[in-house]
Regions:
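Short acidic-glycine-tyrosine-enriched beta hairpin
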Residues: 72-89
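Short beta-strand His + acidic residue motifs that chelate non-heme Fe in jelly-roll/DSBH
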Residues: 48-50, 68-69, 91-98
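Conserved short histidine dyad/triad with adjacent acidic residue
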Residues: 38-53, 88
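Glycine- and acidic-residue-biased ligand/ion/polar-headgroup-sensing regions
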Residues: 54-66, 71-72
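A short hydrophobic beta-strand segment most commonly corresponding to one strand
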Residues: 58, 85, 99-117
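A short, N-terminal "cap"/entry segment at the start of jelly-roll beta-barrel domains
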Residues: 1-35, 114-130
Length: 130
């Protein structure tokens, strides 16, 4: 067992090639035993690329509004207080709404497999008619 106190896990990092738009991650717990825990902050319109996790991912939204979408077409809005479980192997993306930031706590278990970017058309379609 280990308890991580305060900011011992490192400074905020701006994320790059596996995201569209500006995204920052704040390591909450230094990754170990294939478990990563990060606070992630998306500016309006920012999002992950399509990706999947070896075991699973849990997202808990702490502020703003966003979206979670699977490659199979399932998805929906995310708002503060929502928690989502994404099973291992399920291709998905998540990010902020076009007109709102989104912040979530991400708990990822197992390796991440980063795939292609979410097109602007697919991103816009997710929010059409919401």
């Amino acid at each position: 067992m280990r308890i991580s106190r305060g900011r011992e896990s490192g400074p905020s990092e701006q994320r790059g090639p596996t995201f569209t738009g500006r995204v920052w991650a704040d390591p909450v717990l230094k990754a170990e035993d294939s478990v990563g825990v990060n606070n992630v902050f998306f500016e309006p319109g920012a999002r992950t690329h399509w990706h999947r996790h070896e075991v699973a991912q849990v997202l808990h939204v702490i502020g703003g509004q966003g979206w979670l979408q699977t490659r199979a077409g399932d998805g929906g809005p995310l708002t503060a207080g929502d928690t989502a479980h994404i099973p291992g192997g399920e291709e998905h993306w998540h990010g902020a709404a076009p007109d709102s930031y989104m912040a979530h706590l991400a708990i990822s278990v197992g390796a991440n497999d980063w795939l292609d970017p979410v097109s602007d058309e697919d991103y816009a379609a997710a929010f059409r008619g919401r």
